Amino acid sequence: MRRPLAVVLGALLVPAALRAQGDTATFVLPNFHFADGESLAVLKLHSLTLGHPRRDASGHVANAVLILHGTGGTGRLFLNPLFTELYQPGEALDTTTHYIILPDDIGHGRSSKPSDGLRMKFPHYAYADLVTAEYRLVTEGLHVDHLLVVMGTSMGCMHSWMWAERYPDFMDGVVPLACLPTQIAGRNRMLRRMAMDAIRTDPAWQGGDYTSQPPGLRGAAEVLFFMTSAPRRLQRDFPTRDSADAEITRWMDHELATLDANDFLYQFDASRDYDPSRDLGRIKARVLAINSADDEVNPPSLDIMAQLFPKVPHGRYVLLPISDLTRGHGTHTVAAAWKQYFAPFVAGLEHSK
């Protein structure tokens, strides 16, 4: 999911050491076939990596961590200082001892996407295709044969559940941040549908063949703001009419400068095949699932985790109470809010190897 403006601005403040350490690469997959039968002659998958892989006595990679971004995001989101404290010496994902993989999914960032030129003729990918591409990037592009942890935020959170079920022996641990292990329905689906309809029903969209971004894109972005923002946090940070007006103006200006209507439609339509609820009992990896009480995308009042999480054989679920650290749905990128649970989880995985 796209980020609140405070998180977006923070992502621009990338520590120099990380900029110097990170390696970027584009992995090319020829003739990539999608689950619905469509194909793409050349699929480009971009990734950023931090640290270096380390192999154990058996020759398997032992320290790789795959971190998956949310809808509309990129791997560079995890260079945000709110998250990069995890990479510091002695921290849970210390980049001197871990190999961090930060991909851009299909349809996002520097990977192949509709706005590259195909527009609505781009294959209509779904989450299953994104996970397949992630796996091929890891195994064929980066030659990693095992992951210590698969973790992700929002859409990436959902992908982490899919990884746990599709590749149950490939990772030691899974950390889904800010999602539910069931199909997107109810208010969540309705808001997504409203956002997409704001574009599709705009005559200026022209079936995807627009020459400038259609005005309906603004309405779509406004729906996302309602969907992902945290009322308590916004009231605290913008307590006057003028400050609130200034913030929403800055946020909208940034969104409209970076969004593309066709990319947006593909990104939000891709969740149509997501529903890991039936196979939760088949997960072999240890799971640490984390949500926050002020997340309006996945509100705890739905009681979905209470119903489904007991099916996970080796799991722990943490619901973070509302605090000065939580930011609604965006809490997933605020490491300080949840690293007290994450750090011992990772340490436990490493000690059990």
Model regions and ranges:
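Short beta-strand/loop motif that positions the catalytic acidic residue
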Residues: 283, 289-291
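N-terminal cap/lid subdomain of alpha/beta-hydrolase-fold enzymes
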Residues: 48-116
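Catalytic-loop region of hydrolases
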Residues: 21-64, 75-76, 351-353
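Conserved alpha/beta-hydrolase "acid-adjacent" motif
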Residues: 296-303
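Alpha/beta-hydrolase-fold enzymes
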Residues: 170-254
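Cap/lid segment of the alpha/beta-hydrolase catalytic domain
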Residues: 91-141, 186-188, 192-207, 324-326
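Catalytic active-site module of serine/aspartate enzymes centered on a nucleophile-bearing elbow/loop
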Residues: 315-353
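Conserved hydrolase catalytic core segment
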Residues: 146-185
